[in-house]
């Protein structure tokens, strides 16, 4: 059986102050997904940086085990926001507002790296060779307009990601994580929690009416 080739992929923000590596990555080591949920669109609106979402409001993310992620430069520039007290931890570069990753907690072993942070100098074709194409689209009910292609059934995508999550949990691949302290399990940076008013102003329906 041929050995699956893996590679270390550079990570970096637009201003170059925050960078690192995704270790031992292949098309089967994670799951590339496009998410159209209103929370991801709200986060993109909060960052106010072009190119985070596609024309339909989708965010291209790569779900991998946190232990594969190394932030080697500019870690002091890492910032975090939560859309609510129970929301995901959403990480970005404080300087240029490039989104880095979404995580749930120390105990849930996944990190959704933003495509804009993964090998930012690579072309889309080169990225697909390394990571594979998106395996599907989720939360398409929040998409802006009609998607050009019929999306994969969401259940199939969720089941695939669930299998990966179970594997990472069983193998302890959630630690070490650059986003949470190994000893205390606290987030690496104190998150800013948006107020209900701030969050409401960022919702897709609010932005479309402004």
Region locations from a protein language model:
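A short Gly-Trp-Pro
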Residues: 1-12, 18-210
